[in-house]
Swiss-Prot record:
Name of this chain's protein: Ubiquitin-conjugating enzyme E2 S
Pathway(s) per entry: Protein modification; protein ubiquitination
Composition bias type Basic residues, residue spans: 208-221
Cellular component annotations (GO), alphabetically ordered: anaphase-promoting complex; nucleus
Gene name in the database record: ube2s
Length: 221
């Protein structure tokens, strides 16, 4: 997705930077902020699943994207962690009134994040993007909660904080060929057959020397 930094007026960028800095220094409870120095118009966050909900124990990564008309137009919100929720589409898009008709320029990003967290506590089946989840919420809450908790266990309980990071089992940097810590297999160990070869060479040299000495003796006669 293209950055909107160049499209936003300087005064808006200053306000966004100020608010993001404040959020990072003092985030709402259960929410972490991962600001990007390169693109302030795309804010990555993580939200802890609220206790007493099917999402408890999970950490859900999310991002807010500020368009070129922000703050006149609300930001767009996306869950990056897969979640079973009536108001979250299959591609992670979030449907909540504060990001649509109830948006006001003065609300700010903190209000948006708190509203999305509240959405995990009180889903709204009337504006469902995931119709299956919305139907189960209304007709069979036990099944809805079971499905939501299962996906939380699978996708949101990886033991990470939600921060973008490299996989622990990813490729590791190769050691330099001259690294003194790099151990060469077989280094310092006797090579099989070396002793035998040296012995054979020594015996050959002795036989050749004896033949030379014999020829010299015959010449003297």
């Amino acid at each position: 997705m293209n950055s909107n930094v160049e499209n936003l007026p300087p005064q808006v960028l200053r306000l966004v930077y100020k608010e993001v800095s404040a959020l990072a220094a003092d985030p709402p409870e259960g929410i972490k902020i991962y600001p990007s120095e390169e693109d302030i118009t795309e804010l990555h966050t993580s939200i802890e699943g609220p206790e007493g909900t099917p999402y408890a124990g999970g950490v859900f990564r999310m991002r807010l994207v500020l368009g070129k008309d922000f703050p006149a137009v609300p930001p767009r919100g996306y869950f990056l962690t897969k979640i079973f929720h009536p108001n979250v589409g299959h591609k992670g898009e979030i449907c909540v009134n504060v990001l649509k008709r109830d948006w006001k320029a003065e609300l700010g990003l903190r209000h948006v994040l708190l509203t999305i967290k509240c959405l995990l506590i009180h889903p709204n089946p009337e504006s469902a993007l995931n119709e299956e989840a919305g139907k189960l919420l209304l007709e069979d809450y036990k099944e809805y909660a079971s499905r939501a908790h299962l996906l939380t266990e699978i996708h949101a309980m990886g033991g990470t904080s939600g921060a973008p990071q490299e996989p622990a089992d990813g490729p590791q940097p190769k050691k330099h060929a001259g690294d003194p810590n790099k151990r060469v297999v077989g280094a310092g160990l006797p090579t099989m057959g070396t002793g035998t070869n040296n012995s054979n060479i020594s015996n050959t040299n002795i036989v050749a020397k004896k033949k030379t000495d014999k020829k010299r003796a015959l010449r003297r006669l």
